[in-house]
């Protein structure tokens, strides 16, 4: 990695990490989660968010274009750690209902990671005067916040249903 000596370089570095996160989610993580999930409402929510995530990738790629940079993803140990933890635990969960609850929690953790990253990048983009980029990142942020609301609602419903059995 080259030395980072100015805010713009730091911003591009953060974008590379976020591109990795969104690509990994769209290509691998969300489709796998959708296959795992039994609850139809939750499954549909993940399917919809997969499509949103593909748009997030396009928005980040557009951001690179606006900056005159090549969109190169940079590995995110944060998302890889969440995925590894999920894989470690999920194989030990015997009940489909409990697995859905666990998957909802895993999805919420990922949304929090994405929300924090987008908020940080928006602050930097605003400081750099990159208004068009701010708009693209805010679009992604708004969808991540909405996805978090949905997954929290699903998690609450799943816990209530499982506890009532």
Spans of features found by a protein language model:
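Amphipathic alpha-helical hairpins
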Residues: 1-165
